[in-house]
């Protein structure tokens, strides 16, 4: 290294090329040395990290500078999904991120053969419910594997209740008053208990039960009992 060498002088050509590349846009994409340069100098990081830019893109679509580079390069490939999975932890995290209230997760017994997890959440308004569903579905499509089932949405035209079936998870998003009316939590967690309770007859006192009497008077006639 000569006496005039400095890190700034070494990095200046790279910064200049990067600025030219950003200004030129798609025209520079065909230059063969650019991918090698990016591969050499850009730090490696997990492609599945939910960075603010990725979250912003999922909410509002690609930014103007991203759209100019072509939609084909924005499509995620199989390598982009390594390490990320749309499971119950991811679902609950996204619901909390979208300010869902009173999240309830119920693990469904396997013998029911319906789903693995039954999730219930509340929204503050109809718009909030639809926004949460839209975001969940968008994230699922972004992270899903080819073998994962398609999403099924029920209640698209409803104002107070939407249901999304992800296959291994089913989520119900409702307004608080609707949730209080149907009480799905009790239906899925206390159903056997409620069925047994419904079979019990109304409470009645047995014929041989007399409140507050300790002595055995079963052998006495009504007249003798009254005199005693």
Curated annotation (Swiss-Prot):
GO terms for cellular component: cytosol; mitochondrial matrix; mitochondrion. Its main location: mitochondrion. It holds the Pfam family RsfS. Keywords: Mitochondrion, Ribosome biogenesis. GO terms for molecular function: mitochondrial large ribosomal subunit binding. GO terms for biological process: negative regulation of mitochondrial translation; ribosomal large subunit biogenesis. It is found in: Mitochondrion matrix. It comes from the Eukaryota. Residues 53-77 are annotated as: Disordered. InterPro entries: Iojap/RsfS/C7orf30 (IPR004394), NT_sf (IPR043519). Disulfide bonds: none annotated. Required for normal mitochondrial ribosome function and mitochondrial translation. May play a role in ribosome biogenesis by preventing premature association of the 28S and 39S ribosomal subunits. Interacts with mitochondrial ribosomal protein uL14m (MRPL14), probably blocking formation of intersubunit bridge B8, preventing association of the 28S and 39S ribosomal subunits. Addition to isolated mitochondrial ribosomal subunits partially inhibits translation, probably by interfering with the association of the 28S and 39S ribosomal subunits and the formation of functional ribosomes. Associates with the mitochondrial ribosome large subunit (39S) via interaction with MRPL12 and/or MRPL14. The interaction generates steric hindrance that is expected to prevent premature association of the 28S and 39S ribosomal subunits. Identified in a complex composed of MALSU1, MIEF1 upstream open reading frame protein and NDUFAB1; within the trimeric complex, MIEF1 upstream open reading frame protein functions as a bridging scaffold that interacts with MALSU1 on one side, and with NDUFAB1 on the other side. Interacts with MRPL12 and MRPL14. Belongs to the Iojap/RsfS family. This is Mitochondrial assembly of ribosomal large subunit protein 1. The lineage of its organism: Eukaryota, Metazoa, Chordata, Craniata, Vertebrata. The gene is Malsu1.
């Amino acid at each position: 290294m000569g006496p005039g060498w400095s890190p700034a002088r070494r990095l200046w050509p790279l910064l200049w090329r990067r600025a030219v590349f950003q200004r030129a846009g798609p025209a520079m994409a065909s230059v063969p040395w650019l991918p090698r340069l990016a591969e050499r100098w850009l730090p490696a990081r997990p492609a599945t990290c939910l960075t603010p830019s990725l979250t912003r893109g999922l909410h509002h679509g690609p930014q103007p500078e991203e759209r100019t580079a072509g939609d084909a390069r924005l499509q995620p490939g199989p390598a982009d999904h390594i390490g990320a999975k749309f499971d119950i932890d991811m679902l609950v995290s996204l619901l909390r991120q979208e300010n869902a209230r009173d999240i309830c997760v119920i693990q469904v017994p396997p013998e029911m053969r319906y789903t693995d997890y039954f999730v219930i959440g509340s929204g503050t308004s109809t718009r909030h419910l639809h926004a949460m569903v839209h975001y969940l579905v968008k994230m699922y499509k972004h992270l899903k594997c080819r073998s994962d089932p398609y999403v099924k949405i029920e209640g698209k035209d409803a104002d107070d209740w939407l249901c999304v079936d992800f296959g291994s998870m089913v989520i119900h998003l409702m307004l608080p008053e609707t949730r209080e009316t149907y009480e799905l939590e009790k239906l899925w967690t206390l159903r056997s208990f409620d069925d047994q309770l419904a079979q019990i007859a109304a409470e009645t006192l047995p014929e041989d039960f007399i409140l507050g009497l300790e002595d055995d008077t079963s052998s006495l006639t009504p007249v003798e009992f009254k005199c005693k």
